[in-house]
Design a protein with these regions (language model features):
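Generic secretory/membrane-interface signal
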Residues: 1-2, 85
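Short amphipathic beta-strand starts and helix->beta connectors
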Residues: 2-7, 64-68
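Generic N-terminal amphipathic, Lys/Arg-enriched alpha-helix
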Residues: 3-19
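Broad hydrophobic/π-residue packing in well-ordered secondary structure
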Residues: 7-8, 89, 139
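Glycine-rich N-terminal segment of FAD-binding domains in flavoprotein oxidoreductases
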Residues: 14-110
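A gly/ser-rich beta-alpha-beta helix-loop segment of oxidoreductase catalytic cores
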Residues: 103-140
Length: 140
């Protein structure tokens, strides 16, 4: 993208806070555009369950997706569920349990390692880190 195109992004929200908590796709896109336009390093978080894995990231702003969660559509008979990226693994499992269904993979829970308690994180974190777990080889 050229500098001219970058400067032509239209930003309609105030992003002065260090943590941005959008609750819609439009607000997420706006935040990313804003940081891109201003060359601001942006960290994306859900429940921070994988924050201690890998190299530390120095960011000026955090895009917190914990407000962007929930089941959009669930069709148990089709084995289909559509959720927002900030939806917790726990919430999805609870929804699947109602129809005696389960994941065909096993997301790794690093919570016990870092905090001593369960924190499986969000579906966005699982997919973006490719932490589908060991069961995916057999059933995923």
């Amino acid at each position: 993208m050229s500098m001219e195109e970058k400067q032509n992004f239209q930003i309609s929200q105030d992003f002065s806070a260090s943590t941005i908590k959008p609750n819609s796709e439009e607000a997420i896109a706006e935040a990313i555009k804003y940081c891109y336009k201003k060359n601001i390093p942006l960290e994306i978080n859900g429940l921070s369950s994988k924050k201690n894995i890998g190299k530390n990231f120095q960011s000026q702003k955090t895009l917190d997706l914990s407000n962007y969660s929930g089941v959009i559509k669930y069709e148990p008979e089709e084995l289909y569920i559509k959720v927002k990226s900030g939806t917790s693994i726990k919430e999805i499992k609870e929804e699947l349990d109602k129809k005696n269904q389960q994941f065909a993979f096993e997301p790794t829970d690093f919570g016990f390692l870092f905090s001593g308690m369960s924190n499986e994180g969000t579906i966005g974190g699982v997919l973006s880190c490719n932490f589908a777990g060991p069961r995916r080889f057999k059933v995923g």
